[in-house]
Regions:
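C-terminal membrane-solvent junction of multi-pass transporters and transport-like membrane proteins
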Residues: 376-388, 426-491
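Hydrophobic transmembrane alpha-helices that form the core helical bundles
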Residues: 97-177, 181-182, 348-362, 410, ...
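Membrane-interface "cap" regions at the ends of multi-pass membrane proteins
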Residues: 1-78, 96, 508-537
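Transmembrane helix-boundary motif of multi-pass solute transporters/channels
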Residues: 42, 46-151, 261, 270, ...
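Helix-loop-helix junctions that connect adjacent transmembrane segments
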Residues: 9, 14-16, 20-21, 41-46, ...
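Membrane-helix boundary/coupling elements in multi-pass transport proteins
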Residues: 112, 136-150, 259, 264-277, ...
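Membrane-interface loop-to-helix entry segments
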Residues: 169-232, 265, 288-291, 415-426, ...
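TM-loop-TM module centered on a large, flexible mid-protein loop between adjacent transmembrane helices
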Residues: 115-126, 158, 236-243, 256, ...
């Protein structure tokens, strides 16, 4: 423990190979959530198709989606001031780094596809099947990419100055989701190439657009016609006004932190597809920190540009269109309202592509463990050597979330309801890391998270889980219905998973006089799967 207390948060731990023992010395084989083989570097039927640059884009495109353009408006509306908004982004960045360190240690220790599914199964082998069931329920119920499909549709229609009906808005969002599912399901290499191109275009566009705002304000190429009013004594960055209007309600601060953490969601995206990554451990240790620094820099510059160019009240009332307001004020109605919103739509589309790519692999891993119906079909990579079954499992809930809820608060609600169960699993993974360190002190760890970062992550997860139930001063959250609805829905999903697990693995076997056993099978395409079969007692 003493060795780790002086290590920087994202520094790889040195490895003393001659001091290592059997990594499974302290854990009986019958108590492993995964077999020994399943914790070794795996190879997907698709092969090692992801290079370092592809892995970097997979992470950056997942992290930098619509959040940098869509969430600042709702965050400012919740917290009320420039200073508190930037403070929330800073705290969220630090917390994201803590979570990333935990994911990197797990990923280097268990370098195979599946992400949190693998880590929870390995860490919590008892009660049997519980961790796997909860991950499966979350993947099916909350494993969607609806939010960025919604942003894509909203910014595309805004760019063409169309006042859409609700049906048109939803149809465009569903069209994007469907097209991406078809590309990833039928054309593996083409899909990877497209998402790589979109990723680099996205980084260039976001950097250029954000830096343009600073350039216009700082160098005044158009004189005082743009942004001059921002340099009065009541300028948003003047110290006497920077905290004006701050709302320190922990309930609202927590929802804002959820949104910031959502904007950083996906820093561990490469953990979900390590079977397809070349040199997975080395790539993981360099790609993730590089993506974190990239996202942090772009987010900081973008937020400063908003506050310098767009009046605070307009930001608060902008909803998800604050990015469009920035570009409209800088470049006028034609360019600002057309080209730049289209660039934001491209950013959202790139995010949907990489999220779909990664979550399809997670769903396929869940199916291979026998925790989804029709597991043979969903586990197979035929006929296109792609996880088509996993894509279908991802497509259905995303389609329903886009199509069924009414417009209005749906974007904020989706962000919140996705974030809450994620904090529950993040807490379980972080506590589990400490348990594994104690249980297996001699296990090979190519990367080791800084222990204060691990404890900070635990404390913040607990605080964020409690915060939604603390009433805001006016008993109003960031939606027009009950402020804690998202926490109740998120908790209900987890409780439903526990109930389903109990009925499926405990109650029904007790009534039927059988027990569930794992049986290994190999599909025609060479994929190894686990079937859960009934065995009479």
């Amino acid at each position: 423990m003493a060795d780790t207390e002086h290590q920087p948060l994202l520094e790889a731990a040195s490895i003393q190979y001659d001091s290592l023992r059997d990594p499974y010395l302290n854990l009986p084989p019958d108590e492993l959530g995964l077999s020994i083989q399943s914790t070794l570097p795996g190879t997907a039927p698709e092969g090692k198709t992801l290079t370092w640059s592809s892995a970097y884009i997979l992470v950056v495109s997942r992290v930098i989606g619509s959040g940098v353009f869509a969430t600042p408006g709702s965050i400012v509306k919740s917290v009320g001031s420039v200073g508190l908004t930037l403070l929330v982004w800073l705290v969220g960045t630090i917390l994201a780094a803590c979570g990333l360190a935990v994911s990197m240690e797990y990923g280097c220790m268990l370098p195979r596809s599946g992400g949190e599914k693998v880590y929870l199964e390995y860490t919590y082998p008892r009660p049997r099947f519980l961790a796997s069931t909860l991950i499966a329920v979350q993947a099916v119920v909350l494993g969607f990419t609806a939010s960025n499909c919604i942003i894509f549709a909203k910014y595309t229609l805004f760019a063409f100055d169309i006042e859409p009906t609700e049906a048109q808005h939803k149809a465009l969002a569903v069209g994007l989701l469907t097209a991406i599912t078809i590309v990833h399901g039928c054309f593996l290499k083409t899909g990877i190439w497209i998402q790589n191109v979109l990723g680099w275009v996205k980084i260039f566009l976001i950097a250029a657009m954000s830096l343009t705002g600073l350039w216009v304000i700082l160098f005044r190429p158009y004189g005082d016609s743009i942004g001059a009013s921002q340099f009065r004594p009541d300028h948003p960055f003047a110290w006497d006004t920077v905290w004006e209007g701050s709302n320190w309600s922990w309930s609202l601060l927590s929802t804002s932190l959820f949104k910031v953490l959502y904007s950083y969601a996906g820093l561990n995206n490469v953990n979900n597809v390590l079977n397809e990554v070349q040199n997975p451990v080395r790539t993981l240790k360099t790609v993730c920190p590089a993506a974190l620094f990239t996202a942090c820099g772009l987010y900081l510059v973008a937020n400063v540009s908003y506050f310098l160019v767009v009046p605070l009240e307009e930001i608060k009332n902008s909803g998800e269109l604050v990015g469009a307001l920035l570009f409209e004020r800088l470049f006028g109605d034609h360019i600002g309202r057309t080209l730049f919103p289209l660039a934001i739509a491209i950013s959202a589309a790139g995010n949907v592509m990489v999220v779909t790519f990664a979550l399809a692999r997670v769903n396929q891993e869940i199916a291979r463990q026998g925790f989804l119906p029709w597991s043979k079909v969903l586990s197979s990579s035929r006929p296109f050597q792609t996880p088509l079954g996993g894509l279908i499992v991802h497509y259905v809930p995303s389609l329903l979330v886009i199509s069924l809820p009414p417009q209005g608060d749906v974007y904020n609600f989706i962000l919140d309801v996705e974030g809450y169960p994620g904090q529950i699993f993040a807490l379980a993974v972080t506590v589990g890391l400490l348990l594994v360190r104690r249980r297996e002190p001699f296990r090979l760890r190519p990367f080791k998270a800084w222990i204060p970062a691990v404890w900070l992550r635990i404390v913040v997860c607990l605080a964020l889980l409690v915060a939604p139930f603390i009433p805001p001063p006016d008993r109003k959250g960031d939606v027009h219905f009950f402020y804690a609805t998202y926490a109740i829905v998120g908790t209900s999903v987890v409780l439903f998973g526990i109930l389903y697990w109990y009925v499926w693995t405990r109650l029904l076997p007790r009534w039927g006089g059988y027990k569930l056993e794992e049986e290994v099978d190999v599909l025609d395409d060479g994929t190894s799967i686990t079937k859960l079969v009934r065995s009479n007692e």
